[in-house]
């Protein structure tokens, strides 16, 4: 809270997910449950959210929590066995019956399944069976997810984390006591570091076996860093708290192989030197429109163009726009249209090592690619924009749109149907407020499909205070008034106040329902 006007801790909750996948929920019981936030379909616990005293946000992790073991399988006396050290162990066989529906009624089919002590046989590599091992404690994982929502302080939250069944997430935490914390992963098997577990390992060698699960204290985490802030954007934990971040050399590679990305770079920039922060100020940081991914990418393009000595229209005019651009995305920005389509064109058709992803790929396209290819790709970008829209200098909001036509899972888009201009951009370029858009159903425009979905900012004072936003609306029914009633708010970044306490909820109630009763 040292950087906030109130002195209280604040939390930004912004999972970048598929639109309409995380409805906004408030669950309350007389047994002490009072949690608000986002849930994935079917979950009865608040996945990313807050209660009166604690808040939690998950990002996706690259922690290696799954391994593949190549098994040495043979047949002895009519039995399938596999080698483990000097032993031959039986392969476990189980018959699974699956019932399914056909046009004439129900049918069933039997499958033989196989497993070793490592786990089920899932596939083969070069003719050798491979067993896959993961965290398979679904009941315990479900319990941890629910217990998380009822914690009152960091001691309880850390005890919950010690259950160690959360495989796929990192966790950012804040509470009413002023504690902030970051946990990189949770379920992390202990392994022999001499082996490379990013690839399948030899299952016949006992040394490759898991050696238990790391304690929470052994994992990468940060609690109350001196700098006073924490961030993670599906990125490396080694920049999560500026100079107070954990050190890479203190941990095994499998514990944090996550690369840096442009959103992580952007988050660090906006947090450095922050002070006197309010909830509204936190929203402003979260919607900062700078896109660091274009700094190197477009710098390399402009340099390559200058090397040609050319000044022919319309390409020279387009290059000059990018040369003088501040790399900020806005709905009226022609530069953003050019930059996005150039980057996407280069990623789709460019020549680069196939192993490159994310930030490393963008940096290569900016500085490591063939200069003639940069120029040719940009020319093709300008030509295609002219073909599709009748001009190349088209504002970003005319191309980048928000549209919700149906409640179908498979979203469809229509250039002739109503839609809203959006000034946000993809997280690929470093946008903290991400809006990933693509074409669909033969459209020329691009339409948002994922990114900012449920977003909330929370301040943990004497009374918790929060603001939130949801892509489109809460309902999946096009006939509901809540199908797209938040669409304009979403586009504008105009957050609504969250009614958390009972008096706030009752003051805004439109209707009430109890089973068998309504008013």
What are the roles of these predicted feature ranges?
Residues 181-188, 290, 294-295, 306-310, ...:
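Short amphipathic alpha-helical patches
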Residues 1-315, 321-324, 328-331, 445-519:
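Mature extracytoplasmic enzyme cores
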Residues 385-495:
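C-terminal accessory/interaction regions of large nucleic acid-associated machines
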Residues 195-197, 311-411:
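A terminal-accessory region detector
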Residues 136, 140, 210, 246, ...:
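Generic signal for short, ordered secondary-structure residues
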């Amino acid at each position: 809270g040292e950087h906030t006007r109130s002195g209280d801790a604040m939390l930004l909750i912004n999972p970048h997910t598929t639109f309409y996948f995380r409805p906004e929920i408030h669950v309350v019981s007389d047994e002490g449950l009072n949690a608000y936030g986002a849930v994935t379909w079917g979950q009865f616990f608040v996945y990313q959210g807050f209660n009166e005293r604690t808040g939690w946000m998950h990002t996706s992790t690259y922690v290696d929590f799954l391994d593949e073991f190549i098994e040495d399988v043979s047949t002895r006396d009519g039995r399938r066995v596999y080698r483990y050290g000097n032993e031959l162990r039986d392969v476990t066989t189980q018959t699974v019956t699956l019932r399914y529906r056909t046009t004439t009624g129900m049918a069933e089919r039997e499958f033989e399944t196989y497993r070793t002590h490592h786990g089920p046989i899932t596939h083969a590599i070069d003719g050798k069976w491979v067993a896959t091992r993961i965290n398979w404690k679904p009941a315990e994982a479900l319990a941890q997810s629910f217990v998380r929502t009822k914690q009152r302080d960091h001691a309880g939250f850390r005890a919950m984390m010690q259950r160690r069944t959360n495989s796929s997430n990192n966790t950012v935490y804040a509470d009413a006591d002023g504690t902030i914390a970051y946990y990189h992963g949770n379920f992390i098997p202990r392994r022999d570091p001499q082996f490379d577990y990013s690839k399948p390992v030899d299952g016949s060698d006992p040394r490759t076996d898991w050696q238990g699960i790391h304690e929470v204290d052994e994992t990468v985490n940060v609690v109350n860093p001196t700098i006073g802030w924490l961030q993670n954007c599906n990125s490396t934990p080694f920049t999560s708290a500026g100079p107070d971040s954990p050190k890479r050399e203190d941990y095994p590679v499998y514990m944090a192989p996550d690369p840096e990305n442009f959103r992580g770079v952007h988050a660090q920039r906006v947090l450095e030197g922050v002070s006197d922060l309010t909830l509204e100020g936190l929203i402003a940081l979260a919607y900062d429109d700078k896109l660091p991914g274009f700094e190197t990418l477009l710098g390399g393009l402009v340099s390559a163009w200058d090397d040609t000595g050319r000044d022919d229209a319309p390409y020279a005019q387009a290059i000059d726009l990018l040369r003088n651009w501040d790399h900020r995305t806005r709905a009226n920005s022609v530069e953003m249209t050019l930059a996005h389509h150039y980057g996407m064109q280069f990623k789709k058709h460019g020549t680069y090592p196939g192993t490159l992803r994310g930030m490393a790929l963008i940096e290569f396209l900016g500085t490591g690619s063939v200069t003639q290819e940069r120029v040719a790709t940009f020319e093709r970008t300008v030509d295609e924009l002219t073909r599709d829209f009748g001009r190349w200098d088209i504002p970003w909001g005319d191309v980048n749109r928000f549209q919700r036509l149906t409640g179908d899972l498979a979203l469809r888009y229509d250039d002739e149907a109503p839609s809203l201009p959006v000034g946000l951009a993809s997280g690929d370029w470093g946008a903290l407020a991400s809006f990933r858009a693509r074409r669909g159903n033969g459209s020329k425009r691009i339409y948002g499909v994922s990114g900012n979905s449920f977003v909330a900012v929370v301040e943990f004072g004497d009374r918790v205070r929060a603001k939130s936003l949801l892509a489109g609306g809460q309902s999946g029914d096009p006939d509901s008034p809540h199908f797209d009633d938040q669409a304009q708010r979403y586009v504008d970044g105009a957050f609504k106040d969250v009614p958390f306490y009972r008096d706030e909820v009752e003051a805004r109630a439109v209707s009430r329902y109890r089973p068998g009763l309504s008013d």
